[in-house]
């Protein structure tokens, strides 16, 4: 029997690892099945959960004993997927010849390119009308929705993280996945994998989780406000093009550390408004779809048992939840404020759209309003603070990266 088992190194690897890691590995395999299933059923975000679930399931199944790239004379448990711990150029070259996902990881994740590609795609599907027509209102709603980004920083320091790690974790409150990737690469490379995985796990739950927060904090009579007295100013394509190039230039000038993200986002917007069909197809159907697929799959492949048993992982899960919860509460408080200032003309649910998970939080706000009042079509109004949230999150992230590096 032992000889038969030894033919299958994946099974043998269970006996070569600590008990807690073996248990975590089994749990993660089933968790991968769950992510895939709930993504397929549209309970969780399918674009992320389906590839991530496949990655989590298969990477934890495919563990075996193999030579250590750093010291080939030693053996270690690993996979044939990728190694996120390689550092020197020689190790990178050797890893690319062993791990099939290593080239994609090294050339798109390690330098933040994947975040820029996602941002370009998001820009290409973003409608700016309400934001440009009502910039003050949009920003008034977006700033309170950064509550988690501000408050999670001191909480993370209190829980034992250094300022650079705390700032990276705090960006989860902005609910902007590419921004979290960017911040963790700049500030806390040692926690890049767990922070990225935790952020995208929670972001995939936003669509199903925030409705419970909304129903707990906002009575039906407010949720059903139809905003019929509000109008959306029609903005011409020329105005959007001018806005994109001017604002992108100013933001890059003020916050050059985040210039790659600003450039990517506003280039996507310019592609959309220029109406060049080939560019629009390329940015949306190819770049955004392809980068989202590889983002989800590689993040899933990074979620191996050794990451889960990392002592800081439990703290990261707590802090990620706190960050998104506080941002959701802050967004709704901002929504209540503008509802009061407008004497009930504005639905407070547009406030939660300031949490910049584009366009998920805007869709959540619209869905919850529409459930109460079928005439409450607030999606166009929610997109304003949604886009403003992207900009405020980028600015706060740039401030964290610039200032915290000096500590």
Predicted regions mapped to residue ranges:
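N-terminal alpha-helical transmembrane segments of multi-pass membrane transport
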Residues: 1-77, 81-83, 96
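Entry/N-cap segments of selected transmembrane alpha helices
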Residues: 22, 128-153, 198-200, 306-332, ...
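Hydrophobic transmembrane alpha-helices of secondary-active transporters
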Residues: 35, 105-132, 268-271, 288-310
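Interfacial helix-loop-helix linkers and transmembrane-helix boundary segments
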Residues: 40-49, 69, 104, 125-140, ...
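Alpha-helical membrane segments and immediately flanking helix-loop junctions
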Residues: 107-112, 120-128, 139-151, 155, ...
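Alpha-helical transmembrane segments
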Residues: 191-208, 319-328, 350-353
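Membrane-embedded hairpin module used as a gating/binding unit in multi-pass transport
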Residues: 200-276
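Transmembrane helical segments that form the transport core of multi-pass membrane transport proteins
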Residues: 246-334
């Amino acid at each position: 029997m032992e000889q038969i088992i030894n033919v299958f190194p994946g099974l043998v690897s269970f006996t070569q690892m600590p008990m807690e890691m073996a248990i975590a590995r089994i749990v993660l395999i089933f968790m991968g099945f769950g992510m895939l299933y709930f993504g397929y059923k549209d309970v969780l975000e399918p674009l992320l959960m389906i590839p991530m679930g496949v990655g989590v399931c298969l990477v934890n199944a495919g563990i075996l004993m193999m030579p250590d790239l750093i010291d080939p004379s030693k053996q270690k448990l690993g996979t044939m997927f990728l190694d996120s711990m390689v550092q020197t150029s020689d190790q990178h070259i050797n890893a690319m010849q062993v791990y099939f996902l290593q080239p994609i990881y090294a050339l798109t994740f390690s330098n933040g390119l994947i975040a820029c590609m996602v941002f370009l795609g998001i820009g290409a599907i973003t409608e700016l009308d309400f934001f440009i027509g009502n910039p003050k209102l949009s920003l008034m709603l977006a700033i309170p929705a950064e509550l988690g980004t501000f408050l999670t920083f001191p909480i993370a320091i209190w829980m034992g993280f250094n300022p650079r790690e705390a700032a990276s974790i705090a960006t989860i409150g902005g609910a902007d996945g590419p921004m979290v990737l960017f911040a963790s690469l700049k500030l806390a490379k040692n926690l890049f994998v767990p922070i990225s995985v935790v952020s995208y796990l929670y972001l995939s739950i936003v669509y199903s989780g925030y409705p419970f927060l909304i129903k707990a904090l906002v009575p039906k009579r407010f949720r059903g406000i139809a905003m019929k007295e509000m109008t959306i100013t029609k903005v011409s394509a020329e105005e959007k093009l001018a806005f994109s190039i001017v604002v992108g230039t100013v933001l890059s000038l003020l916050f050059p550390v985040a210039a790659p993200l600003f450039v990517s986002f506003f280039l996507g917007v310019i592609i959309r408004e220029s109406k060049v069909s080939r560019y629009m197809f390329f940015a949306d159907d190819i770049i955004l779809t392809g980068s989202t697929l590889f983002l989800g799959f590689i993040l899933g492949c990074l979620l191996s048992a050794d990451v889960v048993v990392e002592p800081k992982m439990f703290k990261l899960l707590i802090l990620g939840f706190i960050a998104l919860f506080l941002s959701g509460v802050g967004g709704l408080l901002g929504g209540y404020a503008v509802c009061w200032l407008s004497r009930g003309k504005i639905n407070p649910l547009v406030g939660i759209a300031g949490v910049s998970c584009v366009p998920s939080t805007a869709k959540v706000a619209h869905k919850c309003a529409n459930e109460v009042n079928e005439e409450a079509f607030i999606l166009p109004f929610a997109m304003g603070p949604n886009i403003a949230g992207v900009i405020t999150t980028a600015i706060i992230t740039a401030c964290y990266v610039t200032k915290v590096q000096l500590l």
